[in-house]
Every structure is written in structure tokens, then in C-alpha cells.
């Protein structure tokens, strides 16, 4: 029996290099290692192609399509870049397409308006949302939609040891990019209000953002960057 060919397409900025891997790359790494098809999976990143300075996303996905257009691909996973869908659908019409949303769909090119989201619903085999909130945002103002191929799959962790509630500390963590797409502005707003109610709690942010626009008061949120590099 022929092995399945499964391609996972990372966003242009994401890398499989452990020194520069982002949230999407880490998610893909953590999930594929448990897949029974892991030997059939090929992960695509911009490192597979020559980089350009303009129209980077467009050239990245077009280069992928041109390179593999004569390859029989069974399943293609697109992560967090709905704008890639039209190209994939054109070049690989027989492939099953899954689209993963890691962020608010209304902030991503290719899913910002109602028509774009209707196109996604009609041209994918599965749509996977990494939180219920992300799913709710996708269906904002959409009516009479079929949810058969829609999955909400919240990101979880492996609980390695039990936690004694009597020993818990008053720390609340935010882990991720420090931007609005990740809800960091909401976290900071809540922290500022809650600290006035009970200043004994600590709000800690782990992450960074190259184009930072949110600057919380140091009295409300402590930003500590990244603690360590996750190795592949």
C-alpha cells in the first residue's frame, strides 16, 4: 500500500530551527511526534526556499506550489495563513486540505471578511481552531453554516505532577507573543484592574514581540522575555 504524503506548511516567518522556532513551529513539533503518520510527514518552512525581500508570503507559497505541483500529495496542512489556501486549492485540487487557526481569524489576511471565511468553509476538508474563542471569532456574523468539518482543539500541556492547592502561589502567567492577536492587551487590562483589588497577586508575561505596541505598567505586569529555547 502506498504511503500517504502529508505536507505541513508553516507560516513564512516560522522556522524549524530550534534557535528561532516560534509558537506554530513548536506546536507542530509537539503534535507530529505523536502522529502514527509521522514518517510520512514533511514540514515546509521558508528555509526550504530562497528568501526574497518583497511579497514574501506570496512568493513563499508560490515557490512551494511550483516545486511540488507534480507531486501526489494526499493531505496538506496550512497553519495560520488562510491567504495560502487559494494557491493550494489551485495547484493541488485533489489534496485534502486542513487549515489551522492559531490566532484571531479577523486579523489574518485571507479570513478578515465574511466572503473570505465562506470561501474557507467551502474549500477545506477540516478547519481546526486552537481555542473556542478563535472559533467564535471565525464565525462572527456568519449565519447558517455547516459545522461538520470544524474542530475546536485547545492547546494543552502534559501534567507531570500533581499540584497541591495549599502550596499554590499567587502568580498568573501569560505565555506567547505580546500582541493583540494573542490577547495580551486583555491580559494587561485585567492585571491593572485586579491589582487595585488585590495587589498580592503577580501577573507575569513570558514572551516577546518585535513590533511591540503594548506597554503595561511595571506595577501591574512583569515581563521576563523567554526563559529558554525549546529543542527539537
Regions found by a protein language model. Give the residues of each.
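N-terminal strand-loop element at the rim of the active site
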Residues: 3, 8-72, 82, 209
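Short donor-sugar binding/catalytic loops of nucleotide-sugar-dependent glycosyltransferases
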Residues: 12-14, 175-180, 194, 209, ...
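Short His-centered aromatic/hydrophobic patch
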Residues: 78-84, 101
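A short, histidine- and acid-enriched strand-loop-helix "catalytic/donor-clamping" loop
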Residues: 95-112
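Short beta-strand->alpha-helix junction loop in the catalytic core
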Residues: 105, 134, 152-162, 210
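A short, active-site helix/loop in glycosyltransferases that binds the activated sugar's phosphate group
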Residues: 118, 122-149, 157-159
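Conserved donor-binding/catalytic core segment of Leloir-type glycosyltransferases
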Residues: 128, 164-182, 188-195, 203-204
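Nucleotide-activated donor-binding/catalytic signature segment of Leloir-type glycosyltransferases, i.e.
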Residues: 212-230
